[in-house]
Amino acid sequence: MSLTGCLPPRPPCSMRRRTSGGGASVSPVVAMASTAGVGGIGNPTPRGKKPFAPWREVPPQVTHTLPPEKKEVFDSLEGWAADTILPYLKPVEESWQPQDHLPDPRSPSFGDEVAALRERAAGLPDDHLVCLVGDMVTEEALPTYQTMLNTMDGGVRDETGAGGSAWAVWTRAWAAEENRHGDLMNKYLYLTGRVDMRQVEKTIQYLIGSGMDPRTENDPYMGFIYTTFQERATSISHGNTARHAGRHGDAALARVCGTVAADEKRHEAAYAAIVAKLFEVDPDYTVRAFARMMRRKVAMPARLMYDGADDRLFARFAAVAQRLGVYTAADYAGIIEFLVARWGVPGLAAGLSGEGRRAQDFVCSLGPRFRRMEERAQEAAKRAPPAAAAPFSWIHGRQVQL
């Protein structure tokens, strides 16, 4: 997962309301210490009571910055989305289902199949299990991601919950495809017997209860850039997890992770196509939205991960993923470079304002800049003492090197 998404705790601050330029609203910042087990966002509870989410400071949240005239852009793309984006979806009857990759409970050999699965999984090291659980927990927070898409302005949200626009159909069908990922990985981990499922399930509930602020300001330009980045990041993460599983002798788990990675790759292609179309019809605003998104850095959707005890659970999970090469800072830089090239940002010329040209220069410089930072960090890491270990409740409190 992206290390840039792991933000250090900030000191408490007082309740205040501010207004950003352009009429955008900024939510109040609630004074909350990062103290686990005391209370939650918007739901103060007496000390000792279990909250819906851990106490966390909520930073200023900028909302609804999309200029009203930009809605016309998405209205004009409705037919294009129906013809170009919806075909990225697979018909349900042609789609894989979790049961296709799991022992069949109707089969007389079900017990033997489960025993074989557990025997293969016994060879997975604890640090790989941590990455697998972290990926699964991220997938299981799907309600949050569908909610995020339906907060976007510009006429792309599903206004009724069963809307007929191409944008609404896409969001629901995308979520339905994504839902299989967490289901499959959850059931697989349950059958392995290697993890503390109650702790994992608590983590999922806490994460959904905590929500996420992707800092996209309800702007679909920024929102679709964010989702493109995230789909590529998850495809990389699941693909690397698949390779690790294969190296440790669990070919079935490798197929599970590879299947999920392939779905994420297809979804990435759809979201990237949307942004490419926006660059075609509105290059100036789109490149400025790209720069705004990257200045905020792309926070991973599971960065509010919490298991009821560990305030730094995501940071530790991310450190393990970085050390194993499941998802690294180099991957983050690589995604930026890929998207800059995919959307033809260096070649933009006509139609750019002065601000647009500055945004173009900024995003084109980011990939190389992050790579240099990563190279320096790697050199420093070689000279540093071995990283400390930390316990993970997901694996019954066993220690894993960070």
Curated annotation (Swiss-Prot):
Subcellular location: Plastid, Chloroplast
Primary site of residence: plastid
GO cellular component, one term: chloroplast
Swiss-Prot/TrEMBL cofactor(s): Fe(2+)
Binding-site residues, Fe cation 1: 139, 178, 181, 264
Pathway: Lipid metabolism; fatty acid metabolism
Cofactor note (record): Binds 2 Fe(2+) ions per subunit.
Key words, A-Z: Chloroplast, Fatty acid biosynthesis, Fatty acid metabolism, Iron, Lipid biosynthesis, Lipid metabolism, Metal-binding, Oxidoreductase, Plastid, Transit peptide
Residues at which Fe cation 2 binds: 178, 231, 264, 267
Example of a GO MF term: metal ion binding
GO biological processes: fatty acid biosynthetic process; fatty acid metabolic process
Keyword Metal-binding: yes
Chain segments carrying region Disordered: 1-66
Enzyme class: oxidoreductase
Family listed: Belongs to the fatty acid desaturase type 2 family.
Role: Introduces a cis double bond in the acyl chain of an acyl-[acyl-carrier protein].
Subunit text: Homodimer.
Protein name as catalogued: Acyl-[acyl-carrier-protein] desaturase 3, chloroplastic
Organism, scientific name: Oryza sativa subsp. japonica (Rice)
Classification of source organism: Eukaryota, Viridiplantae, Streptophyta, Embryophyta, Tracheophyta
